[in-house]
């Protein structure tokens, strides 16, 4: 019997398309506004993975014509100091988007810090005002990763209306906003998590399965409905027997690709889409300046 292989949902290609569209839109709007869009990225401490993500975001900004204002602070920086920096960025007319790179050192309250960002400059879409707008179905800046997933599904013309969608993970970064966006698209949504009983029986019902639990290889082929759309949000750095570090998702890709209809790779699936939506959110805030 011939084994079918799932079609890849190529986040890298779709992200490149979004970046190209943004580049054109920025070129057209910049003469009217008189400056490029601006994104401020705040990083605290020396987490190597965070530093790599920040470099990646700055590179993406340069590619589309967004000015990036990178601000790197020592690990011992206080909440009060960061609060002052964010207040200044809120008032800075050159800055359209503000992003605090997570995770933060233990002594800093990430949620309280995110509250300090002007909701209209909340490039990550994590401010309570923007999450509230999402709950109400209102226009606002949306959480980058789940919005990136939605755009990916849209680009591949994957129908969501009336479909059974299962989100594994309930974080405020991905799981909860992801469920709300799927609900908004008329899917029937189930959220599963670490306390769910018999995860396998839940995921086997999914037409659309979103894995966002942060547990490497959690989803295996026997947990997937044949022909399902499997989106792997997990980004887990693991060390193999030779001591080399590599990135793997929450889905066991090799086995699941033989069952699913569509699947995202890790890396190259959801990651590039997250960055593309970050740029999109910054541009959305920037374009408001043209209307003022």
Curated annotation (Swiss-Prot):
UniProt keyword Signal present: no
Reactions catalysed, as given in the entry: (6R)-5,10-methylene-5,6,7,8-tetrahydrofolate + NADP(+) = (6R)-5,10-methenyltetrahydrofolate + NADPH; (6R)-5,10-methenyltetrahydrofolate + H2O = (6R)-10-formyltetrahydrofolate + H(+)
Pfam families: THF_DHG_CYH, THF_DHG_CYH_C
SUPFAM superfamilies: Aminoacid dehydrogenase-like, N-terminal domain, NAD(P)-binding Rossmann-fold domains
Signal peptide coordinates: none
Pathway assigned to this chain's UniProt record: One-carbon metabolism; tetrahydrofolate interconversion
The protein's Enzyme Commission number: 1.5.1.5, 3.5.4.9
HAMAP family: THF_DHG_CYH (MF_01576)
PANTHER family according to UniProt: C-1-TETRAHYDROFOLATE SYNTHASE, CYTOPLASMIC (PTHR48099:SF5), C-1-TETRAHYDROFOLATE SYNTHASE, CYTOPLASMIC-RELATED (PTHR48099)
NCBIfam families linked to this entry: PRK10792.1, PRK14186.1
Subunit structure: Homodimer.
Purpose of the protein: Catalyzes the oxidation of 5,10-methylenetetrahydrofolate to 5,10-methenyltetrahydrofolate and then the hydrolysis of 5,10-methenyltetrahydrofolate to 10-formyltetrahydrofolate.
Family membership noted in the UniProt record: Belongs to the tetrahydrofolate dehydrogenase/cyclohydrolase family.
Name of the protein in its database record: Bifunctional protein FolD
Organism of derivation: Nostoc punctiforme (strain ATCC 29133 / PCC 73102)
């Amino acid at each position: 019997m011939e084994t079918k292989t799932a079609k890849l949902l190529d986040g890298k290609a779709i992200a490149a398309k979004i970046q190209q569209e943004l580049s054109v839109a920025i070129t057209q709007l910049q003469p009217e506004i008189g400056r490029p869009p601006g994104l401020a990225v705040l990083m605290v401490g020396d987490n190597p993975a965070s530093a790599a993500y920040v470099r990646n975001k700055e590179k993406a900004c340069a590619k589309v014509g967004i000015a990036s204002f990178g601000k790197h602070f020592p690990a011992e920086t206080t909440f009060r100091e960061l609060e002052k920096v964010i207040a200044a960025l809120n008032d800075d007319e050159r800055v359209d988007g503000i992003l605090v790179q997570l995770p933060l050192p233990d002594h800093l309250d990430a949620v309280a810090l995110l509250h300090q960002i002007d909701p209209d400059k909340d490039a990550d879409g994590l401010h309570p005002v923007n999450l509230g707008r999402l709950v109400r179905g209102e226009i606002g800046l949306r959480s980058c990763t789940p919005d990136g997933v939605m755009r990916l599904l849209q680009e591949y013309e994957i129908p969501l209306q009336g479909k059974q969608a299962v989100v594994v993970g309930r974080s405020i970064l991905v799981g909860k906003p992801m469920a709300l966006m799927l609900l908004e698209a008329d899917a029937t949504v189930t959220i599963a998590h670490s306390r769910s009983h018999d995860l396998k029986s839940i995921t086997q019902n999914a037409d659309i399965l979103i894995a966002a639990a942060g547990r490497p290889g959690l989803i295996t082929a026997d947990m997937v409905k044949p022909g399902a759309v499997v989106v792997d949000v997990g980004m887990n750095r693991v060390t193999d027997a030779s001591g080399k570090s590599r990135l793997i998702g929450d889905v066991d890709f090799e086995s699941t690709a033989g069952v699913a209809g569509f699947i995202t790779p890790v890396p190259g699936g959801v990651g590039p889409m997250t960055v593309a939506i970050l740029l999109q959110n910054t541009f959305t805030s920037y374009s408001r300046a043209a209307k003022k």
